[in-house]
Amino acid sequence: NYKFIIKMINNNFVDKNLNNLIDCVKSASAGIMKIYRSDYFGQEEKSDGSPLTMADTISNEIIMDALKKISPDISVVSEENFSDENLKNLDETYWLVDPLDGTKEFINKTDEFTVNIALINKKKSIFGIVAAPVTGKIWHGSIFDNNEFDNNSVKKLRIVMSKSHKSENDRAFLEFLDSIHIK
């Protein structure tokens, strides 16, 4: 099964479906922005205490519908309809979705939120696409891109963290970076 999935994605899947996946995150972003520009987010609280808005729900519906059309045989796990039962019956290959990553930032109107979709196989990401609804920027990549990375070309490292939920681990990591003179 793994070899079939890799061959399918390597030879055809990403190229064949990339435009559909880009359209998917663009549509989800448009749905999010419609709510973002309004005065009403329809905010609720999930069972874990985190916020949920109409934008999360709309984006999730758009993405779920699109992924079912793009790849009906590949399961979808989304933050908005996640359950432990999903994990028990999960295939080796599945889509992992966060339809609105940064809901607190969305609510606080910081413009710092994204739409995230990854294709996972054997617990490894083999394709991912991220959209920033406010800017309209979209990034994507796969293990098959064969892009070379020149480590010597990196002049400056930027660390990005959530403003709304920094943890002790985050603080410890920043202290570690500071201790090795990375600012």
Predicted regions and their residues:
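N-terminal subdomain of lithium-sensitive/metallo-dependent phosphomonoesterases centered on the IMPase/IPPase/PAP
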Residues: 5-100, 167-179
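An extended, acidic
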Residues: 152-183
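ATP-dependent small-molecule kinase catalytic core of the GHMP/sugar-kinase superfamily
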Residues: 131-159, 165
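Intrinsic-disorder-associated, low-complexity terminal segments enriched in Asp/Asn/His/Tyr and depleted
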Residues: 1-2
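DPxDG-like acidic metal-binding loop motif
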Residues: 88-144
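Residue-level signal for inorganic ion chemistry
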Residues: 32, 56, 67, 103, ...
